[in-house]
Amino acid sequence: MSLTITKDNIFPKGYRGRLTEGVTYDERNNTLLWVDIIQGEVHRVFLDNTNINTNTSSSSHETLKWDSSNESIGAICLTNDPNKLIICSKYGLAYGDFSSSTIEYFFKYPHTTNPDEKLRLRSNDGIIDPWGNLWIGVMNDFPIGAKEGIQPEGKLYRIGFSKESNKLTCDVMIENSLISNGLCFNNQGDEFYWTDSLTFKIWKYDYDKTTNKLTNKSVFIDLKQFYPDVEQPEPDGLVMTNNGEIYTCVFSTGTILHVDNQGKEIERIKIAAKRPTCVTIGSGIKNNEMFVTTGHLKLDDEKATIDAINLDGDLGGFLFKLKVDKDLNGQKKNIWGGKV
């Protein structure tokens, strides 16, 4: 039976963003977190608080927001303190603290020493690897993309750490990317999967932790083969299961593609939003809930009203929760290994 996500799956009710992304489940305190990239916001809700199912604002829904309109947030990562996150922002990594409602940079990307690159690039998707290092992609910022089109100026960084000295290291793992997006490691840590959205592919690499090298690049899936009638079937955020299956949001198609560990299609989940952006698995007694973020159709229009009440038409900007009757077996989020 094919799965469909409709307005009945909107969660939490009463909230709608412009470009929601980076959805993350933290089992330590049963919370769901996500970002609105353009708004420069991080959101958190406690899933065991029944107030989040109402149409009114609730103390269970918390927000961290940059003060500067120049800022954006591409991804968030968990730390050893459930109230503190790493926020992957316009210029680098910041700590976000829900206890103090603050955001503060602690690391700037190497490219920000170049004034032109500092202006042109921003964070997009990122993860913590099985050893506690942070992998984050950067790409052209919105004004640059709107004016020039997305250029192959992106990079994928790996931010490492020393527990003894508290010093951070930064390696460029991939260069000249377009839209660095959904990424993950298999459970063994020797295979790395990485999305470059405008190539319409998810790429697979072998990874050697000892040498920190990516080798043997190959195509894991080519979205053009799955969506031959779609001009730009862009793979976006993804989640991997413990047996190597991948769910990837396919931007502009209103679907989430589910493939096995060989890249063969298992199913397509339809969603009532043309622009699904990110998916995660978590929550539920049987690990049987999936959460999806989406982008509003008018996300580029600063004057557009983002209406959380009107449920007519495309439902982009809402988050959705899908509960199924089986264990989805999703990988758990890794924790940043550096000091906080």
Swiss-Prot record:
One of its GO terms (molecular function) is calcium ion binding. This is Cell growth-regulated gene 1 protein. It comes from Candida albicans (strain SC5314 / ATCC MYA-2876). InterPro entries: 6-blade_b-propeller_TolB-like (IPR011042), SGL (IPR013658), SMP-30 (IPR005511). It comes from the Eukaryota. Involved in the cell growth regulation. PANTHER family: REGUCALCIN. Belongs to the SMP-30/CGR1 family. GO terms for biological process: negative regulation of cell growth.
